[in-house]
């Protein structure tokens, strides 16, 4: 023993230990080894390579599905794994025992079969046992009778279905039908369907992971696929910013490249809400009298549209105010009358709309009831006195402008003992809408679109007329090349190679003055 003998002992798992000891080494050699050895699970058919439903086996220990092996034997007459002769009457029907969790187990020891279990089958009965049970209770005691049925058997009737020390039988790469690719189109289709399951590609999976995935398969409900429609922006719903697809396609590797920017499309609600300029007015006719309400539609459009639509379609008709608290508020809007129901016109809760200038500072404030942030539905309440502590917790969208006497009469009603339910029911018999700015905004949008369509069609017609005039005034081409629009006969003849013969004058010779002594005339 030397000094510092443990100085290299780490308190963590090193990379080399993880690869070598942990069995996670992944290099060319291990990848080649995995490619050469692909193990088939014990619960899979050796022919279809899929989980079996009616298992049978050959004397050599290969397990098949009865519906897969019988047609194969009729066609080929040999073992699809070894190539040796095999007929259907030589197949042995296997009887697997299952536990409460649905997994195969030994019917004697009750131990679940795993990839490392030594599994045997008795040919005379077809029962499947663990090697331990047969070794201890049959072979050592020389009691060669089936442990469940007492059917006699010999040692030759013991078939090795799985031996963890000899797994060559489960190597799919060595199966004859895999090597020769003796698969039918139906088998290939089944394999392709199995490959669609993500679990097909999982190399290792413990029992806990298997149970979780099985539970997920039972409870998982896929979402309905929705196809995105590429809306085209017009002059009304076009935003002042783009869709951002060019930048996303340039910076993201998962998006297709886009080279042209398009304006973002505003949703229909945003377009309509921008054209709402005046408040709405609604009357709730109760069995104690009317309640006239003013709704702040330009400031709180979502809550106001939700309330007005429910009033228009009769959603609030014959509903009760289910909650009454003196000196606090009167709550209603639930068709069930329990305080737990009611939906918005969008069939889902909508977000809060808090306006800084609005407050629960007076009697008769109309506000949305909710179960928390952004959970507004159809329920609303009217205050009996100022409740400023409700500010920025509930959306204020209106106020009482008529029917104070009715509200006072309702406030004086007694409630059931221990509850806030009025002893005398307060019922909304009907709701009347006097002014609906959202309907007017919708008509305005439709009118603007019709005007734009009319203008567009008019511009298109004028452009077509302009092109027609240009085509009519354009001279007709009489040829090609330079001067193709010239209609003179000479030009035409010139282009056609028919120039008239024009007499040419003889070229005059140029006289040059001579230098020097030509004669003696001037002497």
From Swiss-Prot:
Gene3D superfamilies: Cyclophilin-like, Zinc/RING finger domain, C3HC4 (zinc finger). It comes from the Eukaryota. One of its GO terms (molecular function) is ubiquitin protein ligase activity. It catalyses: [protein]-peptidylproline (omega=180) = [protein]-peptidylproline (omega=0); S-ubiquitinyl-[E2 ubiquitin-conjugating enzyme]-L-cysteine + [acceptor protein]-L-lysine = [E2 ubiquitin-conjugating enzyme]-L-cysteine + N(6)-ubiquitinyl-[acceptor protein]-L-lysine. Keywords: Developmental protein, Differentiation, Isomerase, Nucleus, Rotamase, Sexual differentiation, Transferase, Ubl conjugation pathway. Residues 38-111 form the U-box domain. The keyword Cell cycle does not apply. Exclusively in the larval body wall striated muscle cells. It is found in: Nucleus. Its EC number is 2.3.2.27, 5.2.1.8. Residues 278-433 form the PPIase cyclophilin-type domain. Pathway: Protein modification; protein ubiquitination. GO terms for cellular component: catalytic step 2 spliceosome. Its main location: nucleus. One of its GO terms (biological process) is protein folding. InterPro entries: Cyclophilin-like_dom_sf, Cyclophilin-type_PPIase_CS, Cyclophilin-type_PPIase_dom, Cyclophilin_A-like, PPIL2_U-box_dom, Ubox_domain, Znf_RING/FYVE/PHD. May catalyze the cis-trans isomerization of proline imidic peptide bonds in oligopeptides thereby assisting the folding of proteins. May also function as a chaperone, playing a role in intracellular transport of proteins. May also have a protein ubiquitin ligase activity acting as an E3 ubiquitin protein ligase or as a ubiquitin-ubiquitin ligase promoting elongation of ubiquitin chains on proteins. Influences the hermaphrodite switch from spermatogenesis to oogenesis. Required for body wall muscle cell development. Interacts with mep-1. Belongs to the cyclophilin-type PPIase family. PPIL2 subfamily. This is Peptidyl-prolyl cis-trans isomerase 4. It comes from Caenorhabditis elegans. The lineage of its organism: Eukaryota, Metazoa, Ecdysozoa, Nematoda, Chromadorea.
